[in-house]
Amino acid sequence: MYYDSRPLMSDSADEKPRDSSSEMLWGFWYPALPGKRVRGRKLERAMLLEVPLVIGRNAAGKPFALRDVCPHRAFPLSFGRFDGASVECAYHGWQFDAHTGQCRHIPSLTADSKLKCERIYAGSFPCEERDGYIWAFMTNPEGRADAAAEIPPAPELPTLSPSYKIARLAADLPCSVDTGIIGLMDPAHGPFVHQAWWWRSRRSIRDKAKQFEPIPNGFRMSPHAPSANSAPYKLLKLITGEPATTMIDFVLPNQRFEQIRAGKYWLSSRTTVTPVKRDLCRLDFVAAWNILPWFPVVSFIIHVLGPRFIRQDTEVIERQGLGLKYEDRMMLVDDADRQARWYFELKAALAESRRTQEAMRHPVSGPVTLRWRS
């Protein structure tokens, strides 16, 4: 049985529901850029969900994110000056509070002007720093504040001990966010895209059975023994002397968490596929671990082999884009593609929940076992 990737809540490939690929998910945190890029009073440009942002730090080092458009003449605020508290537009000198976006000063106003500059706002977005990234909470395209909205804390990578190593990788993906995410969660491409003696090959393909369960805004591959046909997992057992388990979560809008545990040792990672524009995403990967920190095997795998994996995935997406120009309907085949289908159904359920103001109806009703070969 197969499914069209565009049906969201339907089991029929013959139906033709709306395409969700162009829909941006608002009301979530997204990583905007690495925190180390924003230093002193320097202003940095970023783009999330086709919204231009200007990002900086106040005098205390707290990050802020404004819509990079002056409400006066649409001049980019990122060309302006920042004094540690206010951003000044380089066109007419209008000044805006760095965190609220409220206009503080308009140099051209005379003393008897009736214009209340404090009623003018540049778009602003809640901003926090976690795991070496500056995150922006994308409320809406205009950056309008909603006093009634409850903003959750920014995502944070789970760590299981006070002392650990951490590493980060990034890459641009020339695709829509949906294409990037269903590629991220695809379990069957490894033996073909990531062939290597130290990873997998066509000869290593075998039957897999994994149990999944619902979690808020996502689903979990329940803790299980890692793939026996992957050399890094064999090496992990050799190093630690402990049997390993791995658990994988996907959480809307764009996060994949993986946690590997072997006795007292652990590795925790998060991968996000963030829409920059409708046809461009950014992949951000961060991992933390306490596995023999004095022995650089994990660091080597992440810094040397990790970029190779990402390049292979990027190349596949680039080539897939050549075909998507002519055919944007993709088949989703049970059970290997069920996670992709859940992703589309989660997006639809979230949209319906927001429309009706009712609790979201989760597409994964309970524990279920999926089977495929990889």
Mark where each language-model region is.
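Short, mixed-charge, low-aromatic patches
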Residues: 2-4, 21-25, 130-137, 226-227, ...
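Sequence-level motif detector for i,i+2 pairs with an aromatic at +2
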Residues: 27-29, 41, 122, 131, ...
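Enriched - but not universal
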Residues: 29-32, 97, 200-201, 345
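A generic structural signal for short, non-catalytic loop/turn and secondary-structure boundary residues
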Residues: 23-25, 48, 120, 129, ...
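C-terminal catalytic domain of Rieske-type non-heme iron oxygenases
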Residues: 62, 143-374
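Rieske [2Fe-2S] iron-sulfur-binding domain
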Residues: 1-2, 6-13, 17-21, 31-159, ...
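Non-catalytic accessory segments flanking enzyme active sites
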Residues: 25-26, 192
